[in-house]
Design a protein with these regions (language model features):
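Aromatic-Pro/Gly-enriched surface loop or interdomain linker
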Residues: 191-199, 207, 381, 667-792, ...
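A short beta-strand element within beta-rich, extracytoplasmic domains
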Residues: 279-303
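A glycine-rich, often tryptophan-bearing local segment used as a flexible ligand/cofactor-contacting loop or short
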Residues: 796, 800-889, 895, 926
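Non-catalytic propeptide/linker segments at domain boundaries
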Residues: 60-61, 65-169, 359-361, 366-387, ...
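Active-site-adjacent mobile loop/cap segments within catalytic or ligand-binding domains
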Residues: 266, 350, 354-357, 368-376, ...
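Pro/Thr/Ser/Gly-rich low-complexity, intrinsically disordered linker/stalk tracts
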Residues: 567-611, 660-678
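Beta-strand-rich modules
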Residues: 640-660
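Extracellular carbohydrate recognition and processing domains
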Residues: 316-346
Length: 989
């Protein structure tokens, strides 16, 4: 009886202590700031359990305790802080703290965990065979990046058919000049995908990823001379029709679940190691318009398919060899890279494949080739979307790409939900049978992760940022993926993304607002680690001001790339190196006597990543107008390159290390004139990257595209239309009277931003002048120059720059005072006292006075500049009127008579950018006038167009010379500390 009373007393005491502890912890958490992120809501106490028999205390957190990034420091601090609350009588009990369904130490991502990794959260097997696609012409190796890794991303929603409304609609509203369907792409396509590819990854997107509306499709089943030619040639075994159905583009549009894959045939032949048994196929496309095109091929996969099928892409810059592992990815479009092609059919426009291989007797399959993206061709409700394929939802690309209807029409009555499921299901279908999805049939592509990038709703009436949100789903089935991997590894990826953004984006005041483990189809259905990342709120003006900033996009996507890199490498327990930032201070110095140019640059340090220092560089060369070569590696921060007279050479530089390569530098050009009377220095001062003009008052907010659409990095396809509603009175509404409501007139339109390639355009005019050589440099390199007297003239490019450097202007003024000839052109210069006060008139006025006058005149010749948003050039909405000063001469006038360009002494000043002139012959004539004093319309410098080099009807086995088909090519903008030593490399043309 005494023992019973004593036991009851002890139970009572411990129960009281347990209740007391629960009360202490609950009260403590109400004011406790979780370590690591101030944006996450406070944690709550879900439950507290004291188990006397096991002598354990289990504290289960809720709210913020489920939603933060856990690392060793955070876990240690939480344990330490809660341990202090435990009464002395329970000190000997083992404490476990639960967050998001697991002990919080289990939630530490492997990439930041000390000690041994959790076996259930890392891959048991690794893919070590040939990647799906490998660029064999790449002159460098990536040893500690993502080479051999396969990543799938999707850039949000897209245009889809709403059966209830009976029409094609966006999945999200038109707000602040965009929709989520368009806007999310503007992060993923120009920034994140190139970063991952620069690290060596093979990147796949269920949704079309290229902003180009043209498309050329060539196939062995359909012969259409308007598209180009298809030729198959054999010296040994003949190409034979495969028993597997192939691609044939037999229809202009496809209804229901029709797909061109399965409508045609494919060809096959055994691989060989001997050239005398070679079999070739050539596709010679008829390119509708000169420019960059993505190149895709399709084929069939077999158990005995060759792992090293070589495709040679003949393009404007030379020939690039790409190896495809045909054991995977059969029956769909496979991306081989993006290349520059000239309009029409020529010997620089060809894709060729052979059956040459390291191993003989394996199967080589060929079918179709596709260049470009094209317009949507899937019918729903009796109509197509009328949009480019890149603007449509992923499910329609899946249908065009040969995925089964179970992937893109899983809910036939609901196109919206079917689209959501189609994205992760595409990864399962293509990845099935690989080491990462081994227990499902599929196409064997070893995808390791799937990530969906979106923007979110939510707004602030006080101009606060809503910010990003990282989402995963761990509750499906038994909590494991197809491979047996714990689904909590998706939380690791979401957690790293959360932590990376919170760390890297502090300068913008941006912090993740939470990490959610919730039931979303897009993060649930994948059989590899999958997350959704909401980058910002498209409904909140403060977020959108950041979101339109190209530098912000670059920095945010670099944070994403680094988190992906760390995550994938941690899953295989290997080290990593972060790719460098772009180089700075780029310049090209011309040495005519030795017919060489000296290229020099400096590396850019990354204060956030110690491993991101470059160890070497790759220099890319372009001859003439189109197409860079495959690049050459240089060890130092400079090199000499031999050039030939009478040809414009252009150069880009990328920084390299074991983690990959950086974004490219700006493009600089040089030229040796056979009759040079003085060398011109072109200085690129147009470095502006900026979002559109905006206003934010007590009653109104929004973006003003007509005032200034901003300058994006290269192509941009994110606008839906101009904002219509600016009043703040109806924030949060998605209706036509809601704050930010916008039009639809820009949907599907591609708009050109800053290409950083303007010295070539100016240089083409100098070449036409006939008696001047030229070279070029960045503005930052120009500021370091000391010997400007060797140049006959300086051509200063300002584009639509808004910020001007006083040091640059001082050097230009000194150059003029010493007798130098100066040409300055730009669309915003007269708004700057720095420029206006030195070279213009203080009475100069802005372009608002131009009214409806849009044309310009030089020597009675009418011409136009790019005033409006377009796909050829950045726009110049506000060119300057330049008021003449005493002794100055008007060279160019606007249509209303206002002066657009003047010359006084050795200085020519234009209130619009030279490169914005639409007519190339007028532009070249004006440049010649500025240099030599007389205006005339010279011929346009253009590429030669030649006939196709191979016609099957004129080729027989005996006359084919295989050697003629080999490679005959001649052997930033977004960030930036000089390296003390300099080494030179001599590169001959």
């Amino acid at each position: 009886m005494k023992r019973y009373i004593l036991l009851s007393l002890l139970i009572y005491v411990y129960s009281v202590h347990g209740q007391e502890l629960s009360s202490r912890v609950s009260t403590f958490l109400q004011s406790y700031q979780l370590p690591g992120n101030s944006r996450v809501r406070k944690a709550s106490l879900k439950s507290l359990n004291v188990n006397d028999s096991k002598k354990t205390i289990t504290v289960t957190l809720g709210n913020g305790g489920d939603e933060i990034h856990y690392n060793e420091d955070v876990v240690g601090k939480i344990y330490k802080d809660i341990s202090k609350l435990i009464p002395d009588s329970l000190r000997s009990y083992e404490l476990t703290i639960i967050g998001d369904g697991k002990p919080i130490e289990y939630l530490i991502p492997t990439a930041v965990k000390n000690g041994k990794a959790e076996k259930r959260k890392i891959w048991k097997r690794d893919y070590e065979d040939a990647p799906w696609v490998t660029n064999k012409s790449c002159p460098y190796e990536i040893k500690k990046g993502l080479f051999g890794r396969h990543v799938s991303l999707c850039q949000s929603h897209g245009r889809y058919y709403d059966r209830g409304k009976g029409g094609w609609v966006w999945q999200r509203p038109r707000l602040f000049c965009t929709t989520e369907d368009l806007f999310s792409q503007t992060f993923v396509i120009p920034y994140l995908i190139p970063m991952l590819e620069n690290a060596g990854a093979v990147v796949y997107t269920p949704r079309d990823r290229f902003w180009i509306n043209d498309e050329v499709v060539l196939d062995n089943d359909v012969f259409d001379e308007r598209s180009g030619f298809f030729n198959d040639i054999s010296l040994g075994d003949d190409w034979e029709e495969s028993s597997s159905r192939g691609f044939a583009n037999l229809k202009e549009t496809y209804e229901g679940n029709e797909s061109p894959f399965g409508m045609g045939t494919s060809l096959e032949v055994k691989s060989t190691r001997r050239e005398k048994d070679i079999a070739l196929v050539q596709w010679i496309p008829n390119i509708p318009k000169s420019g960059k095109y993505p190149v895709y091929v399709c084929y069939q996969s077999f158990k005995n398919s060759s792992e090293d099928v070589t495709y040679e892409i003949y393009h404007s810059g030379g020939v690039t060899s790409v190896s495809v592992n045909q054991k995977m990815g059969g029956g769909t479009w496979v991306y081989l890279g993006e290349y520059e092609f000239e309009a029409g059919m020529s010997d620089k426009n060809m894709i060729m494949v052979s059956n040459m291989s390291r191993r003989r007797g394996n199967m080589v399959s060929v079918d179709g080739v596709r260049l470009g993206s094209g317009m949507g061709n899937i019918i729903r409700g009796g109509s197509i979307s009328g949009m480019p394929r890149w603007a449509e939802a992923a499910k329609y690309s899946c249908q065009w790409n040969g995925l089964p209807d179970s992937i893109y029409s899983s809910i036939e009555s609901d196109e919206y939900r079917s689209d959501i499921y189609s994205r992760p299901k595409t990864v399962n279908e293509l990845g099935g049978g690989s080491v990462y999805i081994p227990n499902r049939s599929g196409r064997n592509v070893p995808f390791e992760i799937y990530m969906a990038f979106h923007t979110d709703a939510g707004y602030s009436k006080t101009d606060n940022l809503i910010g990003p949100l990282s989402i995963c789903t761990t509750s499906k089935g038994d909590g494991t993926m197809n491979s047996g991997l714990d689904r909590y590894t998706s939380r690791d990826l979401a957690s790293l993304m959360f932590e990376g953004v919170s760390r890297d984006m502090k300068k913008y005041g941006l912090d993740c607002r939470g990490l959610w483990n919730r039931n979303y189809g897009e993060s649930r259905e994948g059989e590899v680690p999958s997350i959704i990342f909401e980058m910002l709120s498209h409904q909140n003006f403060a977020d959108m001001r950041l979101g339109y900033d190209p530098q912000f996009k670059f920095d945010l996507c670099r944070s994403f790339y680094k988190s992906i890199l760390k995550y994938i490498c941690s899953m295989h327990d290997v080290g990593y190196v972060v790719q460098p930032l772009p180089v700075k201070d780029f310049s090209v110095d011309l040495d005519e006597s030795s017919r060489k140019v000296h290229l020099s640059w400096n590396p850019t340090s990354d204060p956030l990543e110690s491993s991101a220092n470059p160890s070497s560089y790759v220099v890319y060369t372009r001859k003439g107008r189109y197409g860079f070569d495959n690049g050459r590696v240089v060890r130092g921060i400079g090199c000499d390159i031999s050039i030939n007279p009478d040809t414009i050479y252009s150069f880009q530089v990328c920084a390299l290390n074991d983690g990959g390569k950086s974004f490219p530098s700006e493009t600089l050009s040089a030229y040796i004139s056979p009759a040079n009377s003085g060398t011109v220095l072109i200085v690129n001062g147009f470095t502006r990257l900026e979002g559109p003009a905006w206003k934010n008052t007590s009653t109104e907010q929004g973006f003003l595209l007509d005032e200034d659409p901003g300058v994006q990095y290269g192509k941009f396809a994110g606008f839906c239309g101009r904002q219509k509603v600016f009043s703040k009175s109806n924030m949060g509404s998605e209706e036509s009277n809601g704050t930010g409501y916008s039009g639809s007139e820009l949907e599907g339109k591609i708009i050109m931003g800053n290409t950083f390639d303007y010295p070539y355009i100016h240089g083409a005019g100098i070449q036409i002048s006939g008696n001047h050589s030229f070279t070029s440099m960045s503005e930052s390199a120009f500021q370091r120059m000391s010997n400007l007297g060797k140049y006959a003239a300086i051509d200063m490019i300002y584009g639509v720059q808004k910020a001007f450097n006083r040091q640059t202007v001082d050097k230009l003024e000194q150059y003029v005072q010493n007798g130098g000839k100066l040409i300055i052109s730009g669309g915003n210069m007269m708004k700057s006292q720095i420029i206006r006060g030195r070279f213009g008139s203080n009475n100069s006025v802005q372009s608002d006075s131009l009214g409806a006058s849009r044309e310009l005149y030089v020597d009675n010749h009418r011409f136009d500049i790019y005033r409006d948003m377009n796909d050829e050039s950045y726009s110049v909405p506000n060119p300057d009127v330049v008021i003449p000063t005493d002794g100055s001469e008007v060279l160019v006038r606007y249509g209303n008579g206002s002066p657009a360009g003047i010359r006084k002494g050795n200085v020519s000043l234009l209130g619009f950018p030279l490169e914005s002139i639409k007519d190339e012959s007028v532009r070249n004539g004006l440049i010649r006038m500025l240099l030599n004093g007389n205006f005339s319309l010279p011929a346009v410098v253009g590429p030669a167009i030649v006939e196709p080099i191979v016609d099957k009807s004129s080729v027989n086995d005996e006359s084919l010379d295989v050697s003629d088909l080999s490679d005959d090519s001649d052997s930033h903008p977004l960030e930036s500390e000089p390296q003390e030593s300099e080494s030179r490399t001599i590169i001959e043309p």
